[in-house]
A protein has these predicted regions:
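Bacterial Sec-dependent N-terminal signal peptides
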Residues: 1-26
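Transmembrane beta-strand segments of Gram-negative outer membrane beta-barrel proteins
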Residues: 23-65, 75-85, 167-171
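Short loop/turn motifs that connect adjacent beta-strands in outer-membrane beta-barrel proteins
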Residues: 23-28, 71-82, 94, 107-111, ...
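Transmembrane beta-barrel strands of outer-membrane/channel proteins
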Residues: 28-41, 83-89, 106, 113-119, ...
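Outer-membrane beta-barrel translocator domains and adjoining extracellular loop/strand segments
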Residues: 42-49, 94-98, 125-132, 177-186, ...
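Extracellular loop and loop/strand-boundary signature of outer-membrane beta-barrel proteins
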Residues: 50-56, 86-90, 131-136, 184-189
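Residues that define the transmembrane beta-barrel architecture of outer-membrane proteins
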Residues: 58-65, 96-100, 140-149, 193-199
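Signature for the C-terminal beta-barrel architecture of outer-membrane proteins
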Residues: 149-241
């Protein structure tokens, strides 16, 4: 086993929140970030690539420059709108230009419609752990999707705030077609144009106004479907789904 010596250099250059109107919760946030690794060995260790929302490289020599903007504004008493764009240019990544986030959200009270790629933390899991998740985790790039969700717990009427629910349903598309085609060796299968589906339902039982303990649990499902399967080196698909 080769000994890996690796050093991490990362700077958070700018993190600015600009309130454009003191009377309204309008917020615009700009971020600029630069990071890099330098060392010897075959691969970068997992603890330098985990919990990065996929913005990392397995190469021991790599770097990136990242810039983003996010804007949130109310439309009226019940509706609000938010959007964000987060781009990166990288060295020794799988791509030299990365659209990390590009999304628009429309919210009505507790219901939210999200379109695009957006970083999200896993449910019911400590996001600071590097072990990932059984279904999804923050070790992978955000998947472009249309997502209808109740992102925060909502008290169910008639339960006196003892039962709360949240959940989502989403459909999207994977964006690794070029990587699949380039990475797969001749004679082996790969699939492109793969679609994505996920849904979840979580419940919280408890009322801290009357009892200090709460119980939380739920179900979550993610699936791949559709797509066309090819054999590397051949032009025609072997399975057209």
């Amino acid at each position: 086993m080769k000994k890996i010596q690796l050093f991490l250099l990362q700077f958070l250059l700018i993190s600015i929140t600009q309130h454009t109107n003191a009377q309204l919760p309008v917020k615009t946030e700009y971020t600029v970030e630069m990071g890099g690794t330098s060392g010897k060995g075959t691969y970068a260790p997992m603890w330098l690539t985990a919990n990065r929302q996929g913005l990392s490289s397995a190469n021991t020599e790599n770097g990136y420059l990242r810039a983003g903007i996010a804007h949130t504004m109310p439309l009226n008493q019940h509706f609000s709108f938010s959007a964000g764009l987060d781009l990166a240019t990288a060295y020794n990544f799988t791509s030299s230009f990365i659209i990390q986030q590009a999304y628009a959200d429309l919210s009505y009270r507790w219901l939210n419609l999200s379109i695009g790629s957006k970083e999200r933390l896993p449910e019911l899991k400590n996001s600071k752990l590097s072990s990932g998740g059984m279904v999804e985790s923050n070790n992978a790039r955000p998947i472009p999707q249309i997502r209808l969700e109740v992102p925060n717990y909502v008290a169910i009427p008639g339960t006196h705030k003892w039962l709360h629910l949240k959940g989502h349903i989403a459909y999207g598309r994977f964006t690794d077609d070029k990587w699949q085609e380039h990475f797969t060796s001749i004679g082996n299968p790969y699939t492109i144009d793969v679609l994505y589906h996920s849904k979840s339902l979580f419940a919280k039982v408890g009322n801290k106004e009357h009892f200090p303990v709460e119980f939380e649990g739920g179900i979550q499902m993610s699936a791949q479907f559709g797509g066309d399967q090819y054999i590397a080196g051949q032009k025609e698909p072997v399975i057209d789904m």
